[in-house]
């Protein structure tokens, strides 16, 4: 699922097609002091695991990252349980054969397909992009991902769609080869939050943003410290120079 968020199908756009301006959300992670909502990150991972991971890989993430500071911050036990819920190919064994085993925290996220050709064949000729850094790879970033997820609607009467193509007002040409991935009730959040389409879109977008920028909170904290340091340094230099020049003026 989520196929072609990154590689939309530009199939003879209709003259009446107009790409709408992206939705703008007041994300908690934006701004100088922005930080991720832990609960949203954990829910976003659940959306990825139960909806997106059937088609999309996240090859740059390991399960242990889910327990690191600044991320979803699952407990060690939760991370182990999450990893163990996946089967990982390993080997060769003493007989030279490959085998499968339960995942470990050190393992990379398991890909839904064994190779690129298999993923293309399973998705009608389209390659479902890896989602590890998808937010950084798209103009508009988080707002783009959220808008596309929320952009499905009935097409205008005079708008032509080919078979296997869907109308999305936030795509260029308003056409996309990905069926609507989110709908209310498609999953049940473990924390009891109502899984509305809007809530799931925000949560998975937050999770994908963290995946693309896992050091965001550390960078923001460092930035604040640097600004405070520069303000103090500038103030110290100003008053030091003022005192030095006052002595020079007196001597003159």
Residues covered by each model-derived region:
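Juxtamembrane interface at the cytosolic side of transmembrane helices
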Residues: 219-224, 228-252
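Hydrophobic secretory-pathway targeting helix
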Residues: 1-18
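Electrostatic cytochrome c docking/interface patches
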Residues: 21-46, 57-76, 192, 212, ...
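Membrane-proximal low-complexity regions enriched in glycine and acidic/polar residues
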Residues: 87-173
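Extended, hydrophilic extramembrane loops/domains of integral membrane proteins
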Residues: 170-172, 178-213
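Extracytoplasmic/secreted proteins, especially bacterial periplasmic and envelope-associated proteins
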Residues: 39, 43, 47, 130, ...
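Acidic/histidine-rich catalytic neighborhood
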Residues: 31, 61-62, 68, 74-107
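The canonical Cys-X-X-Cys-His
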Residues: 48-59, 204
């Amino acid at each position: 699922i989520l196929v072609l968020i990154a590689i939309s199908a530009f199939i003879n756009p209709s003259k009446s097609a107009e790409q709408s301006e992206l939705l703008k959300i007041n994300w908690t992670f934006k701004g100088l002091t922005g930080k991720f909502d832990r609960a949203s990150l954990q829910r976003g991972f659940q959306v990825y695991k139960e909806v997106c991971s059937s088609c999309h890989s996240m090859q740059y993430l390991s399960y242990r990252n889910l327990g690191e500071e600044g991320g979803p911050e699952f407990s060690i036990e939760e991370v182990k349980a999450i990893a163990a819920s996946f089967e990982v190919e390993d080997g060769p064994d003493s007989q030279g054969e490959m085998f499968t085993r339960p995942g470990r925290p050190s393992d990379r996220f398991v890909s839904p397909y064994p190779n690129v050709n298999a993923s293309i064949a399973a998705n009608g000729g389209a390659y479902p992009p890896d989602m590890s850094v998808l937010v950084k790879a798209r103009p508009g970033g988080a707002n783009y991902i959220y808008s596309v997820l929320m952009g499905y609607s009935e097409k205008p009467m005079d708008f032509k769609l080919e078979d296997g193509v869907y109308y999305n007002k936030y795509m260029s040409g308003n056409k996309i080869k990905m069926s609507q991935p989110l709908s209310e009730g498609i999953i049940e959040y473990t924390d009891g939050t109502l899984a509305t389409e809007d809530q799931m879109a925000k949560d998975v977008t937050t999770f994908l943003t963290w995946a693309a920028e896992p050091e965001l909170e550390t960078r923001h904290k460092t930035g604040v410290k640097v600004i405070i340091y520069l303000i103090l340094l500038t103030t110290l230099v100003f008053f030091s120079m003022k005192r030095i020049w006052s002595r020079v003026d007196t001597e003159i």
